[in-house]
Protein backbone atom coordinates (compact mmCIF):
# COMPACT_ATOMS: atom_id res chain seq x y z
CA UNK A 1 0.00 0.00 0.00
CA UNK A 2 0.99 3.65 -0.45
CA UNK A 3 1.14 5.25 3.01
CA UNK A 4 0.62 8.96 3.71
CA UNK A 5 0.50 10.71 7.10
CA UNK A 6 -2.90 11.16 8.77
CA UNK A 7 -2.62 13.40 11.82
CA UNK A 8 -5.31 13.71 14.49
CA UNK A 9 -4.54 15.91 17.47
CA UNK A 10 -1.22 14.81 18.92
CA UNK A 11 -1.12 11.45 17.17
CA UNK A 12 -0.39 10.33 13.63
CA UNK A 13 -2.64 7.36 12.87
CA UNK A 14 -0.47 6.03 10.04
CA UNK A 15 3.20 5.02 10.09
CA UNK A 16 5.73 4.32 7.35
CA UNK A 17 7.89 1.20 7.79
CA UNK A 18 10.60 2.32 5.35
CA UNK A 19 10.65 5.82 6.86
CA UNK A 20 10.93 4.40 10.39
CA UNK A 21 13.86 2.28 9.26
CA UNK A 22 15.52 5.33 7.68
CA UNK A 23 15.06 7.20 10.96
CA UNK A 24 16.66 4.37 12.96
CA UNK A 25 19.55 4.11 10.48
CA UNK A 26 20.12 7.86 10.75
CA UNK A 27 20.48 7.55 14.53
CA UNK A 28 22.78 4.53 14.21
CA UNK A 29 25.00 6.49 11.80
CA UNK A 30 25.22 9.37 14.29
CA UNK A 31 26.51 7.13 17.07
CA UNK A 32 28.88 5.19 14.80
CA UNK A 33 30.41 8.44 13.51
CA UNK A 34 31.34 9.32 17.10
CA UNK A 35 33.46 6.18 17.42
CA UNK A 36 33.38 3.54 20.19
CA UNK A 37 32.15 4.45 23.69
CA UNK A 38 35.15 3.74 25.92
CA UNK A 39 34.47 1.39 28.85
CA UNK A 40 30.84 1.25 27.73
CA UNK A 41 28.22 -1.36 28.67
CA UNK A 42 28.40 -4.87 27.22
CA UNK A 43 25.04 -6.47 28.09
CA UNK A 44 22.10 -4.11 28.25
CA UNK A 45 18.41 -4.31 29.09
CA UNK A 46 16.27 -1.42 27.83
CA UNK A 47 12.75 -1.27 29.26
CA UNK A 48 10.78 0.92 26.85
CA UNK A 49 13.10 0.38 23.87
CA UNK A 50 11.05 1.18 20.78
CA UNK A 51 10.81 4.98 20.56
CA UNK A 52 12.36 8.22 21.80
CA UNK A 53 15.02 8.09 24.49
CA UNK A 54 14.68 4.34 25.05
CA UNK A 55 15.34 3.55 21.39
CA UNK A 56 18.25 6.00 21.38
CA UNK A 57 19.68 4.24 24.46
CA UNK A 58 19.51 0.86 22.75
CA UNK A 59 21.20 2.29 19.65
CA UNK A 60 23.98 3.99 21.65
CA UNK A 61 24.65 0.82 23.66
CA UNK A 62 24.68 -1.47 20.61
CA UNK A 63 26.30 0.66 17.95
CA UNK A 64 28.40 2.86 20.24
CA UNK A 65 29.58 0.26 22.75
CA UNK A 66 29.05 -2.97 20.80
CA UNK A 67 26.66 -4.22 23.49
CA UNK A 68 24.29 -7.15 23.34
CA UNK A 69 20.81 -5.72 23.97
CA UNK A 70 17.41 -6.93 25.08
CA UNK A 71 14.59 -4.48 24.37
CA UNK A 72 11.17 -4.51 26.00
CA UNK A 73 8.21 -2.62 24.52
CA UNK A 74 4.46 -2.79 23.91
CA UNK A 75 3.77 -2.23 20.21
CA UNK A 76 1.34 -3.36 17.51
CA UNK A 77 2.50 -5.06 14.31
CA UNK A 78 1.05 -4.07 10.96
CA UNK A 79 -1.14 -6.24 8.75
CA UNK A 80 -1.39 -6.32 4.97
CA UNK A 81 -3.99 -3.54 5.08
CA UNK A 82 -3.15 -1.54 8.21
CA UNK A 83 0.04 0.01 9.48
CA UNK A 84 1.55 -1.03 12.81
CA UNK A 85 2.85 1.39 15.44
CA UNK A 86 6.03 3.34 14.75
CA UNK A 87 7.68 1.56 17.67
CA UNK A 88 7.11 -1.82 16.01
CA UNK A 89 8.86 -0.67 12.83
CA UNK A 90 11.64 1.02 14.84
CA UNK A 91 12.26 -2.21 16.77
CA UNK A 92 12.21 -4.24 13.55
CA UNK A 93 14.71 -1.84 11.94
CA UNK A 94 16.97 -1.98 14.99
CA UNK A 95 16.84 -5.78 15.00
CA UNK A 96 17.75 -5.92 11.31
CA UNK A 97 20.66 -3.48 11.66
CA UNK A 98 21.98 -5.23 14.79
CA UNK A 99 21.93 -8.64 13.08
CA UNK A 100 23.73 -7.15 10.03
CA UNK A 101 26.41 -5.81 12.39
CA UNK A 102 26.77 -9.18 14.13
CA UNK A 103 25.32 -7.85 17.40
CA UNK A 104 23.09 -9.87 19.74
CA UNK A 105 19.58 -8.39 19.88
CA UNK A 106 16.41 -9.89 21.31
CA UNK A 107 13.08 -8.16 21.82
CA UNK A 108 10.08 -8.81 24.06
CA UNK A 109 6.74 -7.30 23.05
CA UNK A 110 4.40 -7.18 26.03
CA UNK A 111 3.21 -5.21 29.03
CA UNK A 112 6.40 -4.17 30.84
CA UNK A 113 4.35 -3.53 33.99
CA UNK A 114 3.46 -7.23 34.27
CA UNK A 115 5.22 -9.91 36.32
CA UNK A 116 4.95 -12.23 33.30
CA UNK A 117 7.06 -9.83 31.23
CA UNK A 118 9.70 -9.56 33.95
CA UNK A 119 9.87 -13.34 34.20
CA UNK A 120 10.22 -13.74 30.44
CA UNK A 121 13.06 -11.19 30.33
CA UNK A 122 14.87 -12.81 33.27
CA UNK A 123 14.70 -16.21 31.54
CA UNK A 124 16.04 -14.65 28.33
CA UNK A 125 18.96 -13.02 30.20
CA UNK A 126 19.80 -16.29 32.00
CA UNK A 127 19.62 -18.29 28.79
CA UNK A 128 21.53 -15.93 26.46
CA UNK A 129 23.54 -13.36 28.41
CA UNK A 130 23.93 -14.65 31.96
CA UNK A 131 23.80 -11.15 33.44
CA UNK A 132 23.30 -7.54 32.35
CA UNK A 133 25.54 -4.60 33.30
CA UNK A 134 23.16 -1.75 32.37
CA UNK A 135 19.40 -1.42 32.85
CA UNK A 136 17.76 1.55 31.14
CA UNK A 137 14.24 2.37 32.35
CA UNK A 138 12.43 4.47 29.76
CA UNK A 139 8.73 3.69 29.95
CA UNK A 140 6.20 6.34 28.97
CA UNK A 141 2.67 5.05 29.40
CA UNK A 142 -0.56 6.79 30.42
CA UNK A 143 -1.95 3.57 31.93
CA UNK A 144 -0.58 0.88 34.24
CA UNK A 145 -2.16 -2.44 35.10
CA UNK A 146 -0.98 -3.31 38.60
CA UNK A 147 0.79 -6.68 38.46
CA UNK A 148 -0.66 -8.22 41.62
CA UNK A 149 -4.28 -7.02 41.60
CA UNK A 150 -4.91 -6.43 37.88
CA UNK A 151 -6.31 -2.98 38.71
CA UNK A 152 -5.91 -0.53 35.81
CA UNK A 153 -4.64 2.89 36.94
CA UNK A 154 -4.66 5.98 34.70
CA UNK A 155 -2.39 8.99 34.96
CA UNK A 156 -3.51 12.60 34.52
CA UNK A 157 -1.40 15.42 33.07
CA UNK A 158 -2.70 18.20 35.27
CA UNK A 159 -1.60 21.12 37.43
CA UNK A 160 -2.01 20.97 41.20
CA UNK A 161 -3.96 23.50 43.25
CA UNK A 162 -5.38 25.82 40.62
CA UNK A 163 -6.50 26.03 37.00
CA UNK A 164 -3.54 26.45 34.65
CA UNK A 165 -4.16 28.78 31.73
CA UNK A 166 -1.47 29.28 29.14
CA UNK A 167 -0.67 30.14 25.56
CA UNK A 168 -0.50 26.99 23.45
CA UNK A 169 -0.49 25.83 19.84
CA UNK A 170 -3.52 24.14 18.34
CA UNK A 171 -1.38 21.75 16.28
CA UNK A 172 -4.33 20.81 14.04
CA UNK A 173 -4.90 24.40 12.91
CA UNK A 174 -1.37 25.80 13.48
CA UNK A 175 -2.86 28.59 15.57
CA UNK A 176 -2.03 30.14 18.92
CA UNK A 177 -4.79 29.58 21.45
CA UNK A 178 -5.39 29.96 25.16
CA UNK A 179 -5.55 26.55 26.85
CA UNK A 180 -6.84 25.87 30.35
CA UNK A 181 -6.35 22.69 32.36
CA UNK A 182 -8.32 21.93 35.52
CA UNK A 183 -6.30 21.01 38.63
CA UNK A 184 -5.91 17.37 39.62
CA UNK A 185 -7.81 15.74 42.44
CA UNK A 186 -5.83 13.99 45.19
CA UNK A 187 -6.76 10.65 43.61
CA UNK A 188 -5.44 11.78 40.22
CA UNK A 189 -2.17 12.87 41.83
CA UNK A 190 -1.72 9.47 43.51
CA UNK A 191 -2.70 7.61 40.34
CA UNK A 192 -0.14 9.52 38.29
CA UNK A 193 2.56 8.64 40.83
CA UNK A 194 1.48 4.98 40.60
CA UNK A 195 1.69 4.97 36.79
CA UNK A 196 4.66 7.25 36.14
CA UNK A 197 6.62 7.16 39.39
CA UNK A 198 9.43 4.87 40.49
CA UNK A 199 7.47 1.87 41.73
CA UNK A 200 7.75 -0.20 38.55
CA UNK A 201 11.47 0.59 38.15
CA UNK A 202 11.94 -0.74 41.71
CA UNK A 203 9.97 -3.91 40.89
CA UNK A 204 12.16 -4.53 37.83
CA UNK A 205 15.41 -3.98 39.70
CA UNK A 206 14.33 -6.16 42.65
CA UNK A 207 13.27 -8.97 40.29
CA UNK A 208 16.55 -8.77 38.35
CA UNK A 209 18.58 -8.69 41.58
CA UNK A 210 16.72 -11.61 43.17
CA UNK A 211 17.17 -13.66 39.99
CA UNK A 212 20.92 -13.04 40.09
CA UNK A 213 21.02 -11.51 36.61
CA UNK A 214 22.61 -8.16 37.57
CA UNK A 215 26.38 -8.15 37.05
CA UNK A 216 28.72 -6.73 39.70
CA UNK A 217 29.13 -3.02 38.98
CA UNK A 218 25.80 -2.89 37.12
CA UNK A 219 24.35 0.55 36.48
CA UNK A 220 20.75 1.62 36.03
CA UNK A 221 19.32 4.86 34.71
CA UNK A 222 15.73 6.12 34.51
CA UNK A 223 14.73 9.16 32.49
CA UNK A 224 13.06 12.31 33.74
CA UNK A 225 12.30 15.87 32.73
CA UNK A 226 12.21 18.91 34.99
CA UNK A 227 12.01 21.83 32.58
CA UNK A 228 11.84 25.49 33.50
CA UNK A 229 9.50 28.02 35.08
CA UNK A 230 7.75 28.33 31.69
CA UNK A 231 6.46 24.75 31.92
CA UNK A 232 6.54 24.11 35.66
CA UNK A 233 2.81 24.68 36.38
CA UNK A 234 1.78 21.80 34.10
CA UNK A 235 4.93 19.76 34.56
CA UNK A 236 7.25 19.88 37.56
CA UNK A 237 4.71 21.51 39.90
CA UNK A 238 1.91 19.33 38.52
CA UNK A 239 1.03 15.64 38.69
CA UNK A 240 3.93 14.65 36.43
CA UNK A 241 6.39 16.39 38.72
CA UNK A 242 5.08 14.42 41.69
CA UNK A 243 5.62 11.20 39.73
CA UNK A 244 9.14 12.26 38.78
CA UNK A 245 9.90 13.10 42.43
CA UNK A 246 8.89 9.52 43.21
CA UNK A 247 11.42 8.41 40.59
CA UNK A 248 14.10 10.24 42.64
CA UNK A 249 12.93 8.37 45.76
CA UNK A 250 13.19 5.05 43.92
CA UNK A 251 16.64 5.92 42.56
CA UNK A 252 18.03 6.39 46.07
CA UNK A 253 16.80 2.94 47.12
CA UNK A 254 18.03 1.19 43.98
CA UNK A 255 21.36 3.01 44.26
CA UNK A 256 21.80 1.64 47.79
CA UNK A 257 21.06 -1.88 46.54
CA UNK A 258 23.47 -1.72 43.61
CA UNK A 259 26.22 0.00 45.59
CA UNK A 260 26.69 -3.16 47.64
CA UNK A 261 28.02 -4.78 44.44
CA UNK A 262 29.92 -1.79 43.08
CA UNK A 263 27.05 -0.52 40.95
CA UNK A 264 24.94 2.62 40.90
CA UNK A 265 21.58 4.01 39.79
CA UNK A 266 20.60 7.51 38.79
CA UNK A 267 17.78 9.51 37.33
CA UNK A 268 18.96 11.28 34.18
CA UNK A 269 17.17 14.57 33.55
CA UNK A 270 16.91 15.07 29.81
CA UNK A 271 16.05 18.01 27.59
CA UNK A 272 12.67 18.58 25.98
CA UNK A 273 12.33 16.80 22.64
CA UNK A 274 9.52 16.00 20.24
CA UNK A 275 8.01 12.67 21.27
CA UNK A 276 4.50 11.29 21.26
CA UNK A 277 4.55 11.80 25.01
CA UNK A 278 5.60 15.48 24.97
CA UNK A 279 3.20 16.45 22.18
CA UNK A 280 0.31 15.43 24.44
CA UNK A 281 1.25 17.96 27.12
CA UNK A 282 -0.33 21.43 26.73
CA UNK A 283 2.32 24.14 26.32
CA UNK A 284 5.11 21.72 25.33
CA UNK A 285 4.78 22.05 21.52
CA UNK A 286 5.06 25.85 21.82
CA UNK A 287 7.91 25.74 24.33
CA UNK A 288 9.78 23.14 22.25
CA UNK A 289 9.29 25.18 19.06
CA UNK A 290 10.82 28.19 20.81
CA UNK A 291 13.71 26.40 22.49
CA UNK A 292 14.57 24.50 19.29
CA UNK A 293 14.97 27.74 17.34
CA UNK A 294 17.15 29.33 20.01
CA UNK A 295 19.30 26.24 20.58
CA UNK A 296 19.77 25.65 16.85
CA UNK A 297 20.92 29.27 16.45
CA UNK A 298 23.43 28.74 19.27
CA UNK A 299 24.63 25.41 17.86
CA UNK A 300 23.57 23.42 20.94
CA UNK A 301 20.43 21.68 19.66
CA UNK A 302 20.10 17.97 20.44
CA UNK A 303 17.50 15.33 19.67
CA UNK A 304 17.05 12.04 21.56
CA UNK A 305 20.03 10.38 19.90
CA UNK A 306 22.44 13.25 20.49
CA UNK A 307 21.36 13.56 24.14
CA UNK A 308 21.72 9.89 25.00
CA UNK A 309 24.98 9.51 23.11
CA UNK A 310 26.47 12.46 25.02
CA UNK A 311 25.12 11.07 28.31
CA UNK A 312 26.71 7.66 27.78
CA UNK A 313 30.07 9.01 26.59
CA UNK A 314 30.56 11.93 28.97
CA UNK A 315 28.54 11.02 32.08
CA UNK A 316 27.41 7.42 32.59
CA UNK A 317 30.67 6.00 31.20
CA UNK A 318 32.70 9.20 31.32
CA UNK A 319 35.10 10.56 33.90
CA UNK A 320 32.58 12.75 35.75
CA UNK A 321 28.83 12.21 36.10
CA UNK A 322 28.47 15.82 37.31
CA UNK A 323 25.49 14.95 39.54
CA UNK A 324 23.18 17.59 41.00
CA UNK A 325 22.12 17.86 44.68
CA UNK A 326 19.67 14.97 44.20
CA UNK A 327 22.30 12.68 42.59
CA UNK A 328 20.71 13.21 39.18
CA UNK A 329 22.61 13.29 35.89
CA UNK A 330 21.68 16.61 34.27
CA UNK A 331 21.58 16.41 30.48
CA UNK A 332 19.26 19.43 30.35
CA UNK A 333 22.29 21.61 31.11
CA UNK A 334 22.39 23.27 27.68
CA UNK A 335 18.63 23.87 27.51
CA UNK A 336 18.66 25.48 30.96
CA UNK A 337 21.44 27.93 30.14
CA UNK A 338 20.45 31.45 31.18
CA UNK A 339 20.80 32.85 27.66
CA UNK A 340 18.45 30.18 26.24
CA UNK A 341 15.81 30.55 28.94
CA UNK A 342 15.84 34.35 29.01
CA UNK A 343 15.28 34.44 25.24
CA UNK A 344 12.34 32.04 25.70
CA UNK A 345 10.85 34.25 28.43
CA UNK A 346 11.23 37.37 26.29
CA UNK A 347 9.64 35.70 23.27
CA UNK A 348 6.73 34.00 25.02
CA UNK A 349 4.30 36.96 25.40
CA UNK A 350 4.84 38.21 21.85
CA UNK A 351 3.96 35.04 19.92
CA UNK A 352 0.80 35.12 17.80
CA UNK A 353 -0.65 32.86 15.10
CA UNK A 354 0.73 35.31 12.52
CA UNK A 355 4.36 35.34 13.71
CA UNK A 356 4.53 31.75 15.05
CA UNK A 357 6.59 30.51 12.08
CA UNK A 358 9.00 33.46 12.18
CA UNK A 359 9.64 33.63 15.94
CA UNK A 360 9.82 29.89 16.62
CA UNK A 361 10.93 26.71 14.89
CA UNK A 362 7.36 25.41 14.65
CA UNK A 363 8.06 24.05 11.16
CA UNK A 364 10.99 22.11 12.67
CA UNK A 365 8.69 20.85 15.42
CA UNK A 366 6.17 19.57 12.87
CA UNK A 367 8.89 17.97 10.76
CA UNK A 368 10.29 16.21 13.83
CA UNK A 369 6.78 15.08 14.85
CA UNK A 370 6.16 13.48 11.44
CA UNK A 371 9.57 11.82 11.56
CA UNK A 372 8.47 9.96 14.70
CA UNK A 373 6.04 8.09 12.45
CA UNK A 374 8.46 7.61 9.56
CA UNK A 375 7.43 10.54 7.38
CA UNK A 376 9.51 13.35 5.87
CA UNK A 377 12.83 11.50 5.82
CA UNK A 378 15.36 12.07 3.06
CA UNK A 379 15.87 9.27 0.60
CA UNK A 380 12.48 7.61 1.17
CA UNK A 381 10.08 7.27 -1.78
CA UNK A 382 6.71 8.02 -0.21
CA UNK A 383 4.88 7.22 -3.46
CA UNK A 384 6.23 3.66 -3.52
CA UNK A 385 4.11 0.66 -2.65
CA UNK A 386 5.22 -0.75 0.74
CA UNK A 387 4.16 -3.75 2.79
CA UNK A 388 3.07 -2.72 6.31
CA UNK A 389 3.38 -6.33 7.54
CA UNK A 390 6.97 -6.35 8.85
CA UNK A 391 8.14 -9.37 10.84
CA UNK A 392 11.25 -9.78 13.00
CA UNK A 393 12.71 -11.82 15.85
CA UNK A 394 10.46 -10.89 18.78
CA UNK A 395 8.89 -12.74 21.71
CA UNK A 396 5.28 -11.62 21.98
CA UNK A 397 3.49 -12.09 25.30
From Swiss-Prot:
The keyword Lipid metabolism applies. Its EC number is 1.3.1.9. It comes from the Bacteria. Disulfide bonds: none annotated. It catalyses: a 2,3-saturated acyl-[ACP] + NAD(+) = a (2E)-enoyl-[ACP] + NADH + H(+). Pathway: Lipid metabolism; fatty acid biosynthesis. Keywords: Fatty acid biosynthesis, Fatty acid metabolism, Lipid biosynthesis, Lipid metabolism, NAD, Oxidoreductase. The record marks 75 as: Plays an important role in discriminating NADH against NADPH. NAD(+) binds at residues 48-53, 74-75, 111-112, 139-140, 244, 273-275. Gene3D superfamilies: NAD(P)-binding Rossmann-like Domain. Pfam families: Eno-Rase_FAD_bd, Eno-Rase_NADH_b, Enoyl_reductase. The active site is at residue 235. Monomer. NCBIfam families: EnoyACPredFabV, PRK13656.1. This is Enoyl-[acyl-carrier-protein] reductase [NADH]. The gene is fabV.
Amino acid sequence: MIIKPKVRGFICTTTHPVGCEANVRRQIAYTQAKGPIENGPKKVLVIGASTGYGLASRIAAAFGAGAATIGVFFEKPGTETKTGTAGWYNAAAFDKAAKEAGLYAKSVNGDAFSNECRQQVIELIKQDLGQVDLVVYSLASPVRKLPDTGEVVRSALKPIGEVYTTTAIDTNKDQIISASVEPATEEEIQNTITVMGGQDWELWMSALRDAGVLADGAKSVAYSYIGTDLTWPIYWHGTLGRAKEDLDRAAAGIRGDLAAHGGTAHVAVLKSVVTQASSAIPVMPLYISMSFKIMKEKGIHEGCMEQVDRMMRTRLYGSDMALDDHARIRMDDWELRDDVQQTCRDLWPSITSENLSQLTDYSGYKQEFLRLFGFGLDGVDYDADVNPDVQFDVVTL
